[in-house]
């Protein structure tokens, strides 16, 4: 089946663009949604290009002045969307320039197309949307053109690298039966600090409401207690030592098969809004926006508002939108009123800032019970703040009448040690349930049970295959995760499969049959904020008697240790790569990771 419908070409004024173009259309099916036409360049793939403000889109470079044009057949109800950003040289000369941007529609070969958008402006950086109703030309063969030219007091000006046009998309009204995907993830969020999971404090009324409308997984874990490895596993359905991102700052391979890439290939709009992990590569997203407010609370608010703005644009096509909030990540400094909402009475000098917690640990100072309770209250305030933001997104989904057609998946990259192990307030490189357990809630009206709960073991590597299955799309054989809901329903019997985890490709863990086993074959002592984080060669915990994992009973159960060691060895041989090539981390990313406590000397 050919996806090439018609040739296209570029018409240039005073410049030559080395690209042709093509209309590419996917076949329609009940789960595919409306046919989308993407106007792709033929000479090489479009690039993921930024606007200088941390938002990236799949885009085409064009000189100034220039006109890009494509012959297309306009579908009924056709709607054009593209975005324009000016390159840095034009922005630098903005005060002396006046630019004109036009979108035109006309008969193929016509010299003067009808102008449907005509804007005059100074060059600026942030992407600006260009939307046009093409329905007046329904079922007609037309030529769509995108033009830009700039002039100063000296006349017309030229630049070889002038603007970026996001790959234009023409959509038509949504068909019934299409499943959108809204993925909400929160950094450093413990499942057991959500009231939906039985926490006595009412930290999460909005997340609780989502659980009442959906299915809650009580035994969900991350494959690694670090953000970049965990979220890469979520999107690739591979364990960290299989995809290669074994530590923060390591980049996802460009050829990785990702959830976003697979949905984008089936003409989903794909966008991501990130408070954390902003500098990581995320193949498959047509739009990638990193918040830049400068504070965790500000970044979260900015990312949330941008995500809601994007939802308002997603009325006519299937979408995959990912929002990742940093909220509960140390330091624990939620805005009012959440900053003090759960702090118990009684003074404590501990403020919950990351650098302060690091200094306390470096000094070997033990905190009092009051100090720990105070810090936990600050952490819970962060949970309350993030819950408020999640509520705003869910409210927008309902107000836009998208709730009934959208699969909502809520989870976290990892949890947080709250002084349970090694006198530690952080997560990486913890191998314990405090940092490995994550919330997992899925809601899809009419498909998933409302108010349901399950003890079915689940890992972040299972999310991509489960999401694809619920949208009716095939699951790649390369995925290592499982479809948690085959046919949209829980398996008749609870799956007792083990949940595996690792840290830095050197320490391994498994949760199986009510036990947690940690295997450190190299006697490796990982570093952590404030000092070393010692982990014994073998650790075994009976979760039924010791849910907080405080007593290592490996010496009392040698046969259990032997069996679980064999389980981990088989998993490593089957699913993990023996050698992960080291990767260089650029200075900007390194500094950002250091500020978050991910890099420590």
Predicted feature locations:
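Catalytic domains that recognize anionic headgroups
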Residues: 21-94, 100-105, 109-601
């Amino acid at each position: 089946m050919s996806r090439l419908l018609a040739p296209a070409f570029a018409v240039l004024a005073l410049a030559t663009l080395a690209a042709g173009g093509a209309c590419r259309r996917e076949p329609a099916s009940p789960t595919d949604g409306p046919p989308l036409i993407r106007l792709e360049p033929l000479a090489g793939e479009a690039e993921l290009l930024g606007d200088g403000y941390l938002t990236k889109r799949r885009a085409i470079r064009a000189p100034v002045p220039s006109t890009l044009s494509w012959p297309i057949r306009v579908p009924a109800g056709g709607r054009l969307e593209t975005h324009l950003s000016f390159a840095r040289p034009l922005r630098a000369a903005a005060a002396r320039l006046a630019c004109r941007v036009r979108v035109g529609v006309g008969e193929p070969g016509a010299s003067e197309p009808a102008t449907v958008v005509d804007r005059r402006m100074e060059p600026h950086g942030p992407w600006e949307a260009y939307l046009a109703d093409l329905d007046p030309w329904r079922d007609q063969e037309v030529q769509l053109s995108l033009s830009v030219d700039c002039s100063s007091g000296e006349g017309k000006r030229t630049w070889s690298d002038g603007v970026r046009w996001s790959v234009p998309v023409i959509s038509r009204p949504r068909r019934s039966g299409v499943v959108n995907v809204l993925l909400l993830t929160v950094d450093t969020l413990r499942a057991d600090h959500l009231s939906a999971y039985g926490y006595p404090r009412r930290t999460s009324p909005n997340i609780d409401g989502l659980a009442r409308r959906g299915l809650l997984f009580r035994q969900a874990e991350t494959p690694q207690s670090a953000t970049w490895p965990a979220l890469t596993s979520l999107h690739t359905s591979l364990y960290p030592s299989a995809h290669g991102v074994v530590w923060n700052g390591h980049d996802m391979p460009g050829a990785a098969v990702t959830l976003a890439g697979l949905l984008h290939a089936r003409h989903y709009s794909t966008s991501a809004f990130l408070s954390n992990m902003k500098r990581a590569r995320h193949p498959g997203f047509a739009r990638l926006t990193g918040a830049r407010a400068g504070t965790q609370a500000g970044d979260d608010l900015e990312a949330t508002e941008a995500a809601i703005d994007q939802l308002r644009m997603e009325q006519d096509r299937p979408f995959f939108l990912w929002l990742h909030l940093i909220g509960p990540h140390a330091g624990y400094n939620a805005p009012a009123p959440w900053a003090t909402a759960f702090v118990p009475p009684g003074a404590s000098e501990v403020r919950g800032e990351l650098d302060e917690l690091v200094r306390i640990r470096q000094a070997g100072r033990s905190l009092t019970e009051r100090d720990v309770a105070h810090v936990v209250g600050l952490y819970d305030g962060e949970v309350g703040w993030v819950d408020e933001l999640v509520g705003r997104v869910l409210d927008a989904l309902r107000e836009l009448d998208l709730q009934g057609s959208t699969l909502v998946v809520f989870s976290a990259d990892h949890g947080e040690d709250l002084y349970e192990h090694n006198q530690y307030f952080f997560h990486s490189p913890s191998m314990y349930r405090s940092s490995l357990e994550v919330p997992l809630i899925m809601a899809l009206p009419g498909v998933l049970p409302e108010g349901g709960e399950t003890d079915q073991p689940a890992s972040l590597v299972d999310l991509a295959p489960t999401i694809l299955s619920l949208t009716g799309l095939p699951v790649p054989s390369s995925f290592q995760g499982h479809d948690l809901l085959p046919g949209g329903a829980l398996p008749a019997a609870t799956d007792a499969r083990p949940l595996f985890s690792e840290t830095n490709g050197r320490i391994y863990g498994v949760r199986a049959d009510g036990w947690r086993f940690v295997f450190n074959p190299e006697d490796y002592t990982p570093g952590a904020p404030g000092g070393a984080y010692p982990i014994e060669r073998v650790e075994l915990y009976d979760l039924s008697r010791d849910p907080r994992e405080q007593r290592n009973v490996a010496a009392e159960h040698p046969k259990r240790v032997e069996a679980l060691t064999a389980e981990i060895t088989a998993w490593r041989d089957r699913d993990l790569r023996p050698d992960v090539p080291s990767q260089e981390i650029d200075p900007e990313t390194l500094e950002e990771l250091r500020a978050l406590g991910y890099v420590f000397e």
